[in-house]
Amino acid sequence: LKQLEGAYSLICMTAEGLIGCRDPLGVRPLVIGRLNEAIIFASETVALDVVGAEFIRSVDPGEMVIVRDGEMTSIRPFAEQNPRPCIFEYVYFSRPDSIVEGTSVYSVRKAIGAELAAENPVQADIVIPVPDS
């Protein structure tokens, strides 16, 4: 992993189990869920909702989570760094009903819109959204 550079969240399946890991800066999200007896990984919480899984937690920046026989082990192979999550997770990549870093994507988008309206008010009759873009 120390040879990898850039933003990533990885999920690997081996003969022994699953491995989920996130880049040391936490640019890309990765979450852990439980579906019946299985531990699952996803890039956003809404994927857990779609399959009926229960959200357990987010994988921390630089953390590697190993799942064997239904048990999770956490390894932190990197020195702790100041996280730098990508703002595009909130404004573009994630679905509005997802939770990223403990915050509702919808609420972040709404707050950004309110800030934009306060900074640059315009005379308008209607706002046209671009759903799920």
Ranges and model annotations:
Residues 1-133:
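N-terminal segments that mediate ammonia production and transfer
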